[in-house]
Regions:
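Non-transmembrane, membrane-proximal soluble domains of secreted or membrane proteins
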Residues: 1-295
Length: 295
């Protein structure tokens, strides 16, 4: 009986303790926790912090471009992306009608135009859904929170304050790995994963303990994500709440603002010239989602 009861009690203690720790790790962060997003792509990290409204805005991969690398959804970013797509379509359509092209090239351009038109239609649907959601929920709609988000290549956390870290990926599976924090979470395209953590020692304190003035906590990618995988690292600064507040106030001076790519001049066309489509052409549009293209 002893050989049965003692191991059973021992295992029960281990299991109960393990379940408590597991629940502490996996339960959602508190409502007061700092919200921050880590965005992975080949081959770097980007951080996003909420603006004055304290909430992160909605995102959509179809809005991603050089001016909006995280695909943040706002009325302006939707309008600008539609303008860019229209400019690309018009440029390729002009090439098809004014250039002398082989059939293979014409077929390629037609397929590309069809794809861009499908993307444009989906973004129009997104705009409709956004307007309906804003009309129903008002300021509670996630589509109203993106304009003041802070998109930055720095990662800061306040000391002894809970952080709710959302992790996303643009392209392949990455892994947000904070070795000093013993924390890791996969970054999976198409979904958002989360890490809940509370830093308990600051960067300055670690520099004192390690006697290394150059010490930094580090964010790494723990998946072999491509040829330049080694570039996926970003320092993490853990600082006092006062220092964090000062840094955050400075960062908020440069909120996210979607910017259109510059519209490249149309190439000259002659009877003997094959004109390549400029797939990076873009245009400026107004905030009412009305695009205009100057010929």
């Amino acid at each position: 009986l002893v050989w049965t009861v003692v191991p059973a009690l021992f295992l029960a203690v281990i299991i109960i303790f393990g379940l408590r720790v597991w629940n502490d790790i996996t339960t959602p962060a508190s409502a007061e926790a700092l919200k921050v997003e880590l965005y992975a792509k080949q081959f770097d990290w980007t951080a996003r912090y909420p603006g004055a409204d304290g909430a992160l805005g909605a995102t959509d991969f179809r809005l991603i471009n050089d001016g909006n690398p995280l695909g943040i959804v706002t009325r302006e970013s939707v309008a600008m992306r539609l303008g860019e797509l229209k400019a690309e379509i018009d440029a390729m359509d002009s090439t098809m009608h004014h250039g002398i092209l082989p059939d293979v090239k014409v077929n390629e351009l037609e397929a590309r135009i069809a794809k861009l038109e499908r993307t444009s239609a989906r973004i129009v649907n997104l705009r409709t859904m956004m307007e309906q959601d804003i009309a129903e929920k008002g300021e509670a709609s996630p589509y109203t929170h993106g304009a003041d988000d802070v998109v930055i290549k720095e990662f800061h956390l306040p000391l002894r304050m809970e952080a709710d870290i959302m992790v996303r990926s643009r392209d392949v599976i990455h892994s947000a790995y904070l070795p000093h924090m013993r924390a890791q979470m996969n970054a999976v395209p198409g979904m958002t994963t989360r890490i809940k953590m509370t830093p308990t020692i600051s960067t300055d304190s670690m520099r004192t303990v390690t006697k290394n003035e150059a010490f930094d906590f580090i964010l790494l990618c723990n998946k072999i994500c491509g040829a330049s995988h080694y570039n996926m690292q970003m320092p993490l600064v853990v600082e006092s709440p006062a220092d964090y507040k000062a840094w955050y106030a400075e960062a908020m001076k440069k909120p996210f603002q979607p910017s259109a790519l510059p519209l490249a001049p149309a190439p000259a066309v002659s009877d003997s010239t094959v004109v390549a489509a400029d797939t990076t052409a873009a245009m400026k549009v107004d905030t009412t989602a009305t695009a205009s293209l100057k010929n």
